[in-house]
């Protein structure tokens, strides 16, 4: 039987997941920290996190559904061309960007799992913040790729290499990929869109594998809690994605870097 506190925990973590999954601040880091503060840890908590991540993924699918279906050859009307070249974003770009992190993730799965703790997250928050600053300070003044369809295969693979940094819990997958994109000549907005689209197969694969391994932790009694978390994460992520894409046309990533440093300091104060 799910009690009211469990539903409260589900709602809070759903908000945290939806709000942070696609911002360059690390959803995993925030989920670990908030989970520790709420006393919601262990195998059941990990299974819950997988479920609500699926809610965030669904939000990306809703926002980019035309582009996603277009990648697999299913077209619903004409998708606007984004960029100044005659190129097109293809499934090949996404697959190339997936290879580095998938390979490294499978090879070092156990090592990565051992890093899911507040101390490791604290260091990753700082490192990810420094990368955001580096992306803003050292990005090309005139990016070659001004839209999604300008991104080359080489740039896609390079972004995939940066994505490997996100295997460190607390680093931020979106932070790593967007920063990487900016450093290799993709403008901030296009890099963000590419990061969100890339998140769908990456997160579906990782979440699907984790869910398969965690099926025995699921019970019908937990269904209300999981439903609250899933729906909350979906709604909040939908709002966060649209708001973020609007904001980055006007602001840099410096505020996000500063926020990461503040959270890292808070983690040190609370957990160290």
From Swiss-Prot:
Please state the Enzyme Commission number of this protein.
3.6.1.27
GO molecular function term, any single one:
undecaprenyl-diphosphatase activity
Q: What class of enzyme is it?
A: hydrolase
Q: Does the keyword Oxidoreductase apply?
A: no
Q: Please provide the record's keywords in A-Z order.
A: Antibiotic resistance, Cell inner membrane, Cell membrane, Cell shape, Cell wall biogenesis/degradation, Hydrolase, Membrane, Peptidoglycan synthesis, Transmembrane, Transmembrane helix
Query: Which domain of life, per UniProt?
Result: Bacteria
- Report the catalytic activity: di-trans,octa-cis-undecaprenyl diphosphate + H2O = di-trans,octa-cis-undecaprenyl phosphate + phosphate + H(+)
Could you confirm whether the keyword Cell membrane appears in this record?
A: yes
Please report the record's description of how this protein sits within the membrane: Multi-pass membrane protein
- Extra information: Bacitracin is thought to be involved in the inhibition of peptidoglycan synthesis by sequestering undecaprenyl diphosphate, thereby reducing the pool of lipid carrier available.
Similarity remark: Belongs to the UppP family.
| PANTHER family per UniProt | UNDECAPRENYL-DIPHOSPHATASE
Q: Which HAMAP family match?
A: Undec_diphosphatase (MF_01006)
What's this protein's name?
A: Undecaprenyl-diphosphatase
Task: Give the source species.
Answer: Yersinia enterocolitica serotype O:8 / biotype 1B (strain NCTC 13174 / 8081)
